[in-house]
Amino acid sequence: MNKLKSNFILNIVILFTILIFNINFINCENQKQQQHQQQQQQQQQQSSSTTTTLPIYSIKFSSETGFTIYSGNDSTSIAQSGFSNEMMTMGWAYLTITTNSQFEDSLQAEAAGYIEGYLTFEMIWQCWYNILVNEYQNQTIPNQVLNWANENIAYMKQQVATNENDPYWINIGLVLTQLSGMVDGYNAANQDPSRQLSFLDFILINMDADLGDISSTFNQSTSFSEISNFKKSMDHIKKTDHCSGLIKLTDDLTELYSAHTSWSSYINMLRIFKSYNFKFSSITNIKSKLTLFSGYPATIASLDDFYLLDTKLVVLETTNGLNNNDLYYLIKPESVLTWMRVIIANRLANGGQSWCETFERENSGTYNNQWMIVDYNKFVPGVKVRDGTLFVLEQVPGYIEFADVTNVLRTGYWPSYNIPYFETIFNMSGFNDELTDSSDYEAYEEDARSQIFRRDANKVYSLTDFQAIMRYNNFQNDPLSHGDAANQISSRFDLNSPDSQDYDAFGGVDSKVTSFSLVNQLLVIAQSGPTHDQEPPFQWSSANWSNIYPSIGMPNLYDFGWVNFTDISYNY
């Protein structure tokens, strides 16, 4: 009898336990479903705002008159472009260019550059002025810099001429042609002779991120004294140029987010979100015709970097930098700079592996970054994350390493915060010398942003959550910041004490986010300016910043919201 009673009680306990488990499981699934529905509603709301109507221009060419730009969307023209400068209303300008496959590739590229230079000429001059005054300290650019750039251009042109059947060099040639067209378009629109710019000037703007490492190759003897001030400026840029990146897989596998927050001097907040849709012929072997990216006046690469491609690849990077002077001798003009190699890799790749293999060619050893390539073709919502979804590549002079790191992503997220992931790159970059008190793993894992991502990344359930983490800065109340506004996902060096060593108009200057759902719409959501979620908006007129840093073309107050960008329109 007692045995029967005991069995009865045991069965009751088991049934009760199963019941509680099922209730908890159902509640958990309901919660996930609600979160997923909320996420979908947010994305629908993000993409359902009133779309702004862009003025459209077309461009044609004749041997007698050259290029002519006229109003209207002429499908028989070489290219059509829409442009609107909304810097004062949303913190971005927007540019879209589509070329016509009926014309030769070189004419498409030149026309695309020309119409961009023509339509954006005012912003290009503003960008050049800000760079000249702030980065070059209004001095003549040193001959060593100009000579290096000219040697690099000559090398590429020679390779283009020699390898006329190689898609890699064919596309390098088209990039140079596009930039040459932009120079001509800019100078045609600019009526002030004192503001004429050369092809080399445009090259210098595009190679701005590479210049920090190039300047470190110059001999520092007294015979090169003219380099001194320039190099000090470039060393500062290289030392402080960082970003935050995050790839986040939701717990229920229904969504995969990708985002990037650029860190830069606030002088670089003159922004254009760009869409290039180039219809080049099969000889170029391009896989991606359409590129949507966050950029700047006069640049044909992102430089942040953040790209959404029509091949459903998302490409982003954060800067690792180089703390090892022993590698600078490997940086030679006989190479292709990073800003151009990423364009070629974007065009020629059909996945993470091929992107890395293309980017690996002609390593310049400059602008040494951690690159993340997210292949949304490999992602099956709610089912699995297939191998090849996330590739990571890291570079130093003379060496590149890459790997499929999807297994790391399967644990929930991949963070990026300016410390190399691969041990060989970590050691070659000199991080082992900089961080002698801790092991490589500890240095990688215990960075402030690493700890913030570890604490907060798995709390991301929706698009709104994801946007918030990329704009996060609560340094006064977050113990992980140690009271430093720089130790946050979106830094604000300007909020540190004026007495501190790193007090400056520098920090996170934007955020760009996308996801599986948004990639299928060719949609990126972006916000311009320093974060103001938990902190006050940045204002040039405060703390005398406008007297320290000329910032023509920019609004005084950066309190803008998020903007939706597609390949043909934007809304906010």
UniProtKB/Swiss-Prot annotation:
Residues 1-28 form the signal peptide. GO terms for cellular component: extracellular region. Pfam families: Phospholip_B. Keywords: Glycoprotein, Hydrolase, Lipid degradation, Lipid metabolism, Secreted, Signal. Its main location: secreted. One of its GO terms (molecular function) is phospholipase activity. Its EC number is 3.1.1.-. It is found in: Secreted. GO terms for biological process: phosphatidylethanolamine catabolic process; phosphatidylinositol catabolic process; phospholipid catabolic process. Glycans are attached at residues 73, 138, 219, 427, 544, 564. Belongs to the phospholipase B-like family. PANTHER family: PHOSPHOLIPASE B-LIKE PROTEIN B-RELATED, PHOSPHOLIPASE B-RELATED. Probable phospholipase. This is Phospholipase B-like protein B.
